[in-house]
Amino acid sequence: MAEVEEQGRKLSEESTDESEEEDTEEEPKLKYERLTNGVTEILQKDAASCMTVHDKFLALGTHFGKVFLLDIQGNVTQKFEISSVKINQISLDESGDHVGICSEDGKVQVFGLYTREGFHENFDCPIKVVALHPQFSKSNNKQFVTGGNKLLLYERNWLNRWKTSVLHEGEGNITSVKWRGNLIAWANNVGVKIYDIGSKQRITNVLRDNTSLRPDMYPCSLCWKDNTTLIIGWGCSVKICAVKERDPTEMRDLPSRYVEIVSAFETEFFISGLAPLADQLVTLYYVKENSDHMEEEFRTRPRLDIIQPLPEGCEEISSDALTVRNFQENQCRDYRLEHSEGESLFYIISPKDIVVAKERDQDDHIDWLLEKKKYEEALMAAEISFKNIKRHDVQKIGMAYINHLVEKGDYDTAARKCQKVLGKNMDLWENEVYRFKTIGQLKAISQYLPRGDLRLRPAIYEMILHDFLKTDYEGFATLIREWPGELYNNMAIVQAVNEHLKKDPTNSILLTTLAELYTYDQRYDRALEIYLRLRHKDVYQLIHKHNLFSSIKDKIVLLMDFDKEKAVDMLLDNEDKISMDKVVEELKDRPELLHVYLHKLFKRDHHKGQKYHERQISLYAEFDRPNLLPFLRESMHCPLEKALEICQQRHFVEETVFLLSRMGNCRRALQMIMEELANVDKAIEFAKEQDDRELWEDLISYSIDKPPFITGLLNNIGTHVDPILLIHRIKEGMEIPNLRDSLVKILHDYNLQILLREGCKKILVADSLSLLQRMHRTQKKGVRVDEENICESCHTPILPSDTAQAFGVVVFHCRHMFHKECLPSPGSIPGIQYCNICSAKRRGPGSGILEMKK
């Protein structure tokens, strides 16, 4: 393969100007290789003069009159000694069973390769061309043409004899002929003709354009693209001719077919051969000697171009200058282009060299991409066409890409590509890891190592972790978090981290990572110690997740120091695992923390921690006075004497006032408000809460010689105490601030009270009347009495079985019923006013009597 590629590079040197550098980056469309083996030996002693191509084999004619049959690798399978001079043309039928040969000395031979039948004829002039009928193997198509100074048609008649017909003469030598279907195309010195063998008519004459060129030096090239399309190349001119059926109404004396030139254009170079390639053309050029577009060393090299024909021109698709042997000595007539339609193979024949051009496949495309170091595109192309490529392997291309990236120093991209390229190949993975270690780039490949079902040996991961531990603590910590612990020997890594901690014992990154390693190893106590030491936010999650409450019983202070709120919530939520008494015991030397715990406990449940309420008094007094009074108000288990003692010691007046009032010493409490707080509003509020006339008297007595207090009392006591009592006790001549406003307010409040009382009275009267009327309406209604009702006294049916007899029934408005004789006082009916049952509960409306008798 390397030899072929080398030959291809030598054969496909671009003949473009150096300034057009971008063109050199275009991928060639064709690849080339020399036809070697037997051909090499033949051309060393002889020279190629012509060749024809069949799907099964090749037929090569030489200047020394020999014809060789070759396989497609160039090995000789048969040899024919035809003449001693140049073989001008070889023709094969479609089956490849018969061959026609003509030579410069006038010999023509047509024979079967596998039969004894044949035709041998010697002419007195050189025979330049020969063409067999494409279906020559069939008995009714035994026809061929030869061309020297005239074109002759040979046909075998029914007597098995050859009949000769002259198709054309008088216009010089016949230089080229091509037979396709029923159409024979040939070229002479004047132009190109087409003969329809079916209608026996010549249907066109396409004149040559440049008559100054010698036909023998620049021969015409003919090629059938299909049964109706002929391509003519002559000199620098290309014409594409379409054979069409003529409309019967226009025929008259004209041939049934005609030719239309659908495309015609000039080329820059002389045409030595043509071949179709789909809707494009492959053209073999002999380069003009005076071309300004070619460097001197390339001017005589033949070119093989792919062009796209247009109605009035063409577009060049690709162009390759071919370095054939002895190209400096060759002329335009020395080159030929033959093609194999089935495989798109193109043979460039020169006297000393035969080159095969073929379309490039996906393997060739990948070769070119690799040669241009376009590894990513090559890898993508291989992945897309992995079923079709034969010479390449996706993984090998990927490895070449990785090697290229490493050479460039793009280690991150190289490492990322390892995931895709190396796949599940453990050996390749390990080799790449060691290579990255050698170049000091383990960090680049670390994040792409397999960590799922596919895993490398633990030593590989440990090697990378040790490398990070030496150079990058943060990267090491990241790998520990991201890699599953099963990838490496956890104990070995723990030991390595501990060794580093000996040098840097306070390094938080290493400590945190060590805690994570301990956690994975289920040594939660060790991890918990580190988290608490670091005050790490994950400590509470660790405790909950792994149920480490038994491990924190002696670490409660550490937890509280880290985050009081979270710690207390956790302790209270898990009282079944860490008892309240244990927490209090642990916090006894840290009263500020104990207070936080007991305070939250009290907020959750006022009774759960009742045995600690006495201790909480001093804790509130010391650390949280704002919550002391609410605690005293809400606690039902607080010893009041102890609380009073503490509050008095600390001179907490408000708390002392509350405790005194709760203990029944309201007068002392009021005195403290008046004397120590000197706040008449609070004193009045306190008196209102207690609602005790004696307290009001004490308040008035204390305030009577204090004008500001009198003002406050006048403004606030109107709804609780008759203001006249206060006004009568004010000393004459005492100056009282805002007295007028206070008196106006008193009068206003009094009037408001009167109005409220009158309004309430009216409402009560109206409601009473409404209810009385409703009761009267209700009592006026009849009461249903039937056999289902019973006497509430004797519990027998209220109605007798014989209703014809006289009976008496007493029915009360409460719906209780009695036999008249069952009532306790069998006197006159007016003496029985109330239901015995209802009277025992209460006496009121609804217990009146209704009498029913018959």
From Swiss-Prot:
<comment type="function">
    <text>Plays a role in vesicle-mediated protein trafficking to lysosomal compartments including the endocytic membrane transport and autophagic pathways. Believed to act as a core component of the putative HOPS and CORVET endosomal tethering complexes.</text>
</comment>
<dbReference type="InterPro" id="IPR001841">
    <property type="entry name" value="Znf_RING"/>
</dbReference>
<dbReference type="Pfam" id="PF23411">
    <property type="entry name" value="Beta-prop_Vps41"/>
</dbReference>
<dbReference type="InterPro" id="IPR000547">
    <property type="entry name" value="Clathrin_H-chain/VPS_repeat"/>
</dbReference>
<feature type="repeat" description="CHCR">
    <location>
        <begin position="568"/>
        <end position="712"/>
    </location>
</feature>
<keyword id="KW-0072">Autophagy</keyword>
<dbReference type="GO" id="GO:0016236">
    <property type="term" value="P:macroautophagy"/>
</dbReference>
<dbReference type="GO" id="GO:0030136">
    <property type="term" value="C:clathrin-coated vesicle"/>
</dbReference>
<dbReference type="GO" id="GO:0006623">
    <property type="term" value="P:protein targeting to vacuole"/>
</dbReference>
<keyword id="KW-0963">Cytoplasm</keyword>
<dbReference type="GO" id="GO:0005829">
    <property type="term" value="C:cytosol"/>
</dbReference>
<dbReference type="InterPro" id="IPR016902">
    <property type="entry name" value="VPS41"/>
</dbReference>
<dbReference type="GO" id="GO:0008333">
    <property type="term" value="P:endosome to lysosome transport"/>
</dbReference>
<keyword id="KW-0813">Transport</keyword>
<keyword id="KW-0862">Zinc</keyword>
<feature type="region of interest" description="Disordered">
    <location>
        <begin position="1"/>
        <end position="30"/>
    </location>
</feature>
<dbReference type="Pfam" id="PF23555">
    <property type="entry name" value="zf-RING_Vps41"/>
</dbReference>
<comment type="similarity">
    <text>Belongs to the VPS41 family.</text>
</comment>
<keyword id="KW-0175">Coiled coil</keyword>
<dbReference type="InterPro" id="IPR011990">
    <property type="entry name" value="TPR-like_helical_dom_sf"/>
</dbReference>
<keyword id="KW-0653">Protein transport</keyword>
<keyword id="KW-0967">Endosome</keyword>
<feature type="zinc finger region" description="RING-type; atypical">
    <location>
        <begin position="791"/>
        <end position="839"/>
    </location>
</feature>
<dbReference type="GO" id="GO:0008270">
    <property type="term" value="F:zinc ion binding"/>
</dbReference>
<dbReference type="GO" id="GO:0031902">
    <property type="term" value="C:late endosome membrane"/>
</dbReference>
<keyword id="KW-0458">Lysosome</keyword>
<dbReference type="GO" id="GO:0030897">
    <property type="term" value="C:HOPS complex"/>
</dbReference>
<dbReference type="GO" id="GO:0005770">
    <property type="term" value="C:late endosome"/>
</dbReference>
<keyword id="KW-0968">Cytoplasmic vesicle</keyword>
<dbReference type="GO" id="GO:0005765">
    <property type="term" value="C:lysosomal membrane"/>
</dbReference>
<feature type="compositionally biased region" description="Acidic residues">
    <location>
        <begin position="14"/>
        <end position="26"/>
    </location>
</feature>
<dbReference type="InterPro" id="IPR045111">
    <property type="entry name" value="Vps41/Vps8"/>
</dbReference>
<dbReference type="GO" id="GO:0005794">
    <property type="term" value="C:Golgi apparatus"/>
</dbReference>
<feature type="compositionally biased region" description="Basic and acidic residues">
    <location>
        <begin position="1"/>
        <end position="13"/>
    </location>
</feature>
<dbReference type="InterPro" id="IPR036322">
    <property type="entry name" value="WD40_repeat_dom_sf"/>
</dbReference>
<keyword id="KW-0333">Golgi apparatus</keyword>
<dbReference type="InterPro" id="IPR015943">
    <property type="entry name" value="WD40/YVTN_repeat-like_dom_sf"/>
</dbReference>
<keyword id="KW-0863">Zinc-finger</keyword>
<dbReference type="GO" id="GO:0009267">
    <property type="term" value="P:cellular response to starvation"/>
</dbReference>
<dbReference type="GO" id="GO:0034058">
    <property type="term" value="P:endosomal vesicle fusion"/>
</dbReference>
<protein>
    <recommendedName>
        <fullName>Vacuolar protein sorting-associated protein 41 homolog</fullName>
    </recommendedName>
</protein>
<keyword id="KW-0472">Membrane</keyword>
